[in-house]
């Protein structure tokens, strides 16, 4: 039988008697005499049918020894015999009942272990508590009860509770976290309300733990699952608890920080150094919907805490259409949407089925708009629903103490503007603007091609530029001038130094907002001011270059780029006005860089240069005066103890240390505080009063220093508007620098713009994304304009490059209108106000949308929103339904656009319906991606070699079997498919010809000209290599 050390303590120690220890008759008689005498002295009564249980031997022996009637040898022998007798009598009395009781007790302990009530590393809990301290069966431990109390106040959050050097998650939080983090879950109660059927089997909550050093990593993993996590910290130390006299209870705890994906980056306290901060682009929405029978009106306020940007919008959309709402989701990337009333099932589906993981939060409004926002933004005046949306965001951010951002009016801006276009969500998705459609990473996207930014705030601004291309030709030319100028000046020492400083710098925009929220650390404030000071120093050290090339009317930069000249001029003036170096000089560098958060605030300031140091210095002088009194008290102590070299043990508690051999010379009114084997430490009545007085002044100094630090932060926040403007200038410069780096690629050319509408003339244009992936790309021309072709019907084999070609055209337009060079030999564009796409086939099962329904919904949006200055990319419209219906829809759409004449937008139309190529119109042209057919042994179908070159004319085959071959489908299967395809094609041609001949016969018999014309047209359409002339 295996030994169980944790259970063996329940066995009472006893030894087996040897035969040599058997009692003699004389010893039995002596023992019985002792029992009789013990029974007389025992006050307890026993039943008459059993002998009295012997009292402890030392009592009886003590009586005999006092009477002088016992000798040592007899006492020892009698004691041993008495113990043996008691053991045997008790064993006989208990018998098997004792064994059964022990077995039951052991079973209960093992059940507690299996139920999680006894932890494997807490073996002392195996011992059952005395009856006086044993808890009630269903009573929670103090820690579990504390968690329950906190959880009931924060049911919408996952609570991470600090317990020593770990963080614990309990109950339903533990179940969720253990699944996300893939860590062990210790069994226990699974719900805080104890509603789970198995909860009654356990006395403690289920839990899982993580080390405190890994909290940041695990928090980010939880944030990726869009969980709201509250961090519960201990609000008292063991020393404070000991002094408070409550050391037996649990530490007091409270929720000290709350994290969500949108608020993590602005509220985190880990000092992350990553360039890409979690939730950097995520936002919080306040949304109000007003539903009408025919449309829904939306009132939106979107807040990005990291950038400080507050976007507001008021728009309406027809019922059952959500393109405009989805577009705003793509732009602002909300992770949390705050609403007051219900949105309706259709609108909620949009959030639940979007690519972003969005959480809906319903809150009740508290207070009035006029009471909270005394100076409202002009756009909110009179718009009550929009005010309500702002109030919803304010109420939600108040929980995180981030609402101060909403009081800076310069952060507000409308979603729509007359200076830029808004790319629809379908275009952002199908053109791979921010992420590729394969693995959703940034590689393989337009952002990946253009992103050479050096700062986080520059990257955020670049995303905004890409998503909202300019539609003002003067602003586009200004950006192109700046890109060209910076490309020629990149070797200048001032430009190079500025570029390096931005690359190695902090996220100034994020830190500025953290300062405004009061969430920053002392170290972060110092680094923020230091970088701004370095920028100011850079501009002042190159003042001659700036005066000559920027400020002068004939300066090289001012002559080449008014945008760059304005940026450098504003920054130069700002650095001269704002006293950043003075602020930095007020900080003690050693204390600022110290990572110890408990370091006194007074040490953060350099009091010799701090302009408000008088109260702090005065309080320090009070402390020095008390320390002087303590030194005088030390002189008196030396005299009393006759030890002239005596000093205090330390200058914290000011204790007097004396050897234990000399304690007798200590006055009686001294208080012993601590002692060791060698020494004892005392506090005199005088030092006790002075130490209390010293502590009082130190606390006053700490409070005063904290007030001065908060005042110092407010002085920086008071410059928020000017600082934000300067940082925006730096982000604009960073974006220009990024576009300049892209424009320096080989064979990139500056695009030209003309005021004439509807023009795309590109020679040897290339797809920038595919080319950047080190794939050899065949250049192609584009020629669309008002005088020539406005519609291109593009046919050709599958995988021939049709979709890549039309995407290339859209990407070139976007790059040109954000002010970047394009990959082409020559490029000329007009200004486009919208880019619409209908590319790809996909469904949405969660919203009950089939592939064809999505196609038609997108086409409705395009037909209603497009103008003559729009660019349309239509890829295989009608593919989601039957062939005949698909052809009919495509034909009807083309005829609709052709009939618009001059109001027709520029269209690139991909199709596999060869009959559509028979349509002729002055504004329509047929093109195909060229290829070469070749015959291979063992293959009945023609193989295709792709040339990826656009040519005029239409293709008569899609060569789908060739794609099947590329996918490694067996040759026999493809041969059979080719045979069936040929038979079906011949059958369709035969049926069409017979029907047409019959129609002609009847028409000739009836002399009907209309019927004859219809029959002839049907016959001609049945021939693949004939052309159908449509009289438009």
Curated annotation (Swiss-Prot):
SMART domains: MUTSac (SM00534), MUTSd (SM00533). InterPro entries: DNA_mismatch_repair_MutS-lik_N, DNA_mismatch_repair_MutS/MSH, DNA_mismatch_repair_MutS_C, DNA_mismatch_repair_MutS_core, DNA_mismatch_repair_MutS_N, DNA_mismatch_repair_MutS_sf, DNA_mmatch_repair_MutS_con_dom, MutS. ATP binds at residues 796-803. It is found in: Nucleus. It holds the Pfam family MutS_V. GO terms for biological process: meiotic mismatch repair; mismatch repair; mitotic recombination; removal of nonhomologous ends; replication fork arrest. Keywords: ATP-binding, DNA damage, DNA repair, DNA-binding, Nucleotide-binding, Nucleus. Residues 1-59 are annotated as: Disordered. Residues 136-262 are annotated as: Mispair-binding domain. Its main location: nucleus. GO terms for molecular function: ATP binding; ATP-dependent DNA damage sensor activity; double-strand/single-strand DNA junction binding; double-stranded DNA binding; heteroduplex DNA loop binding; Y-form DNA binding. GO terms for cellular component: MutSbeta complex; nucleus. The keyword Ubl conjugation does not apply. Residues 18-29 have a biased composition (Basic and acidic residues). Belongs to the DNA mismatch repair MutS family. MSH3 subfamily. Component of the post-replicative DNA mismatch repair system (MMR). Heterodimerizes with MSH2 to form MutS beta, which binds to DNA mismatches thereby initiating DNA repair. MSH3 provides substrate-binding and substrate specificity to the complex. When bound, the MutS beta heterodimer bends the DNA helix and shields approximately 20 base pairs. Acts mainly to repair insertion-deletion loops (IDLs) from 2 to 13 nucleotides in size, but can also repair base-base and single insertion-deletion mismatches that occur during replication. This is DNA mismatch repair protein MSH3. It comes from Eremothecium gossypii (strain ATCC 10895 / CBS 109.51 / FGSC 9923 / NRRL Y-1056). The lineage of its organism: Eukaryota, Fungi, Dikarya, Ascomycota, Saccharomycotina.
């Amino acid at each position: 039988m295996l030994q169980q050390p944790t259970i063996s303590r329940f066995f009472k120690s006893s030894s087996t008697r040897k035969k040599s220890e058997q009692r003699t008759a004389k010893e039995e008689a002596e023992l019985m005499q002792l029992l009789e005498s013990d029974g007389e002295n025992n006050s307890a009564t026993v039943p008459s049918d059993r002998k009295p249980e012997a009292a402890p031997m030392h009592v009886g022996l003590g009586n005999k020894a006092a009477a002088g009637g016992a000798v040592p040898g007899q006492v020892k022998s009698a004691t041993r015999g008495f113990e043996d007798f008691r053991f045997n009598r008790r064993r006989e009395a208990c018998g098997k009942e004792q064994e059964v009781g022990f077995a039951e007790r052991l079973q209960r302990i093992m059940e507690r272990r299996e139920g999680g009530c006894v932890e494997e590393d807490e073996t002392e809990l195996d011992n059952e508590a005395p009856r006086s301290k044993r808890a009630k069966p269903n009573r929670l431990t103090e820690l579990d009860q504390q968690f329950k109390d906190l959880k009931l106040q924060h049911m919408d959050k996952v609570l991470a509770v600090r317990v020593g050097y770990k963080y614990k998650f309990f109950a339903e939080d533990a179940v969720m976290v253990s699944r996300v983090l893939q860590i062990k879950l210790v069994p226990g109660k699974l719900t805080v309300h104890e509603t789970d059927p198995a909860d009654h089997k356990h006395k403690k909550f289920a839990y899982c733990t993580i080390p405190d050093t890994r909290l940041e990593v695990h928090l980010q993993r939880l944030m990726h699952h869009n969980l709201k996590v509250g961090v519960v910290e201990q609000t008292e130390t063991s020393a404070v608890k000991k002094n408070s006299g409550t050391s037996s209870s649990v530490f007091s705890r409270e929720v000290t920080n709350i994290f969500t994906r949108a608020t993590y980056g602005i509220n985190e306290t880990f000092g992350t150094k990553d360039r890409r901060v979690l939730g950097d682009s995520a936002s919080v929405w306040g949304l109000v919907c007003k539903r009408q029978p025919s449309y829904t009106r939306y009132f939106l306020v979107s807040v990005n805490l990291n950038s400080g940007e507050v976007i507001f919008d008021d728009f309406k959309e027809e019922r059952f259409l959500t393109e405009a709402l989805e577009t705003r989701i793509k732009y602002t990337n909300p992770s949390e949407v705050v609403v007051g009333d219900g949105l309706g099932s259709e609108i909620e589906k949009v959030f639940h089925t979007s690519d972003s993981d969005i959480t809906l939060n319903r809150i009740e409004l508290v207070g009035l708009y006029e009471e909270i926002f005394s100076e409202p933004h002009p756009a909110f005046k009179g718009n009550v629903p929009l005010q309500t949306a702002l109030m919803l965001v304010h109420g939600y951010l108040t929980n995180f103490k981030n609402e101060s951002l909403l009081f800076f009016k310069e952060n507000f801006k409308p979603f729509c503007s007359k200076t830029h276009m808004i790319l629809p969500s379908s275009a952002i998705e199908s053109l791979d603007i921010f992420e590729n459609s394969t693995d959703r990473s940034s590689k393989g996207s337009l952002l990946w091609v253009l992103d050479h930014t050096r700062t986080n705030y520059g990257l955020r601004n670049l995303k905004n530029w890409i998503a909202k291309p300019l539609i003002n030709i003067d602003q586009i030319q200004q950006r192109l001038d700046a890109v060209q100028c910076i490309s020629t000046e990149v070797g200048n020492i001032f430009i190079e130094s500025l570029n390096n400083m931005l690359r190695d710098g902090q996220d100034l925009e994020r830190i500025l907002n953290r300062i405004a929220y009061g969430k920053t650390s002392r170290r972060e404030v110092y680094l923020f001011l230091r970088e701004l000071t370095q920028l100011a120093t850079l501009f002042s050290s190159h003042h001659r270059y700036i005066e000559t090339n920027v400020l002068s009317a004939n300066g090289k930069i001012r002559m080449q780029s008014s945008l760059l000249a304005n940026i450098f001029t504003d920054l130069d003036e700002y650095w001269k006005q704002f006293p950043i170096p003075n602020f930095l000089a007020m900080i003690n560098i050693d204390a600022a860089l110290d990572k110890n958060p408990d370091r006194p605030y007074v040490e953060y300031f350099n009091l010799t240069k701090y302009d408000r140091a008088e109260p702090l210095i005065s309080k320090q002088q009070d402390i020095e005066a008390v320390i002087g009194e303590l030194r005088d008290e030390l002189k008196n102590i030396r005299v009393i103890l006759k030890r002239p070299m005596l000093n205090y043990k330390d200058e914290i508690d000011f204790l007097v240390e004396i050897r234990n051999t000399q304690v007798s010379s200590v006055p009686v009114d001294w208080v012993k505080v601590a002692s060791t084997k060698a020494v004892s430490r005392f506090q005199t009545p005088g030092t006790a009063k002075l130490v209390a007085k010293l502590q009082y002044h130190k606390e006053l100094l700490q409070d005063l220093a904290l007030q001065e630090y908060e005042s110092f932060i407010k002085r920086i926040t008071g410059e928020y508007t000017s600082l934000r403007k300067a940082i925006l200038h730096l982000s604009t410069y960073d974006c220009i620098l990024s576009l300049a780096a892209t424009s320096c690629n080989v064979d990139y050319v500056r695009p030209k713009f003309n005021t004439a509408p509807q023009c795309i003339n590109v020679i040897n244009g290339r797809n920038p994304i595919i080319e950047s992936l080190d794939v050899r790309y065949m250049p192609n021309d584009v020629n669309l304009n008002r005088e020539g072709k406005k519609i291109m019907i593009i046919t050709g084999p599958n995988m021939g490059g049709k979709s890549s070609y039309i995407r290339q055209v859209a990407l070139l337009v976007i790059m040109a209108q954000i002010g970047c060079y394009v990959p082409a030999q020559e490029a000329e564009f007009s200004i486009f106000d919208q880019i619409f796409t209908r590319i790809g086939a996909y469904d949405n099962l969660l919203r009950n949308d089939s592939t064809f329904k999505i196609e038609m919904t997108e086409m409705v949006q395009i037909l209603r929103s497009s103008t003559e200055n729009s660019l349309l990319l239509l890829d295989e419209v009608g593919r989601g339904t039957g062939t005949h219906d698909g052809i009919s829809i495509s034909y009807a759409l083309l005829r609709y656009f052709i009939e618009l004449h001059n109001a027709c937008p520029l269209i690139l139309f991909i199709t596999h319906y060869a009959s559509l190529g028979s349509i002729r119109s002055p504004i329509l042209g047929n093109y195909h991606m060229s290829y070469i057919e070749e015959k291979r042994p063992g293959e009945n179908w023609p193989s295709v070699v792709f040339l990826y070159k656009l040519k005029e004319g239409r293709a008569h085959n899609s060569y789908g079997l060739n794609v099947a071959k590329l996918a490694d489908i067996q040759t026999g299967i493809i041969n059979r498919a080719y045979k069936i395809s040929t038979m079906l094609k011949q059958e369709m041609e035969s049926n069409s010809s017979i029907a047409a001949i019959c129609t002609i016969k009847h028409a000739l018999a009836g002399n009907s000209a209309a019927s004859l014309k219809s029959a002839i047209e049907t016959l001609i359409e049945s021939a693949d290599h004939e052309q159908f002339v449509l009289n438009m």
